[in-house]
Each structure stands twice: as C-alpha cells, then as structure tokens.
Amino acid sequence: MARIAGIDIPREKRVEIALTYVYGIGLTRSKLILANAGVNPDIRVKDLSDSDVQKLRGATEEFTLEGDLRRKEGMALKRLQDIGCVRGRRHRMSLPVRGQRTRTNARTRRGSRKTVAGRKK
C-alpha cells in the first residue's frame, strides 16, 4: 500500500481518487500533483512503481497537508476568538458565523433542541 503524507492510500482505486484520502488534497489539487509528477491519473495505486510513488511524495511536499493543515486551521479560529471579533465570538458560542438566521433553523451548528417547559395558561 502506498503511503503519502503519512496516510495509506487505497490500493484498488485510481491514483487521482486515492490521493483525495489525504486531508488537504481534493480532486483539483490531486490532478495538479499528478501533472507535476508526470504520473498517469488513470492507473491504479497497486500498479504504481516505486519511482512513481517517490515522485508523488515529492510533489505533495510543497503543500500543507494533514496535521499541519489541521493545526493551521485551528490556530486561525483560535486567533479570531482571542481578538474578540464577531466571527470569533460566534465560533465560541457555536452559532452560525456568516450571518444566517438563528431564530429558526441553524440546528446543525446549535445542536439538538433543548426542551423548555411550557408556561401555564
């Protein structure tokens, strides 16, 4: 099994698709990496030669991937929260950040409903 950026990519899939299993590589970036490395995107991972795998590793080195990318995204959110801007406060309160309504909807961000006892009439 080929190991790229610390991830075992699936053997039976085409290289173009298998690279997307690495966090930070989507289909567009996968095609770019394969073009830079000069590897045919239609071959299966199990059919890659060792030199092809080395080329792919070299081509992925120039991108921020996996743990480094997750850390970078986390630090960006933490920075927003630390400076106290609106976006940071909304992240901290687990509310939608981009101006969506919250009186109804926003269930994914706010979590499941908290039942409130009704008033007596």
UniProtKB/Swiss-Prot annotation:
Q: What name does UniProt use for this protein? A: Small ribosomal subunit protein uS13
Choose one Gene Ontology CC annotation of this protein and give it.
Answer: small ribosomal subunit
Q: Which UniProt keywords apply?
A: Ribonucleoprotein, Ribosomal protein, RNA-binding, rRNA-binding, tRNA-binding
**Region (Disordered) residue spans:** 91-121
Which spans does this entry mark as compositional bias, Basic residues? 100-121
Family classification: Belongs to the universal ribosomal protein uS13 family.
MF terms in GO: rRNA binding; structural constituent of ribosome; tRNA binding
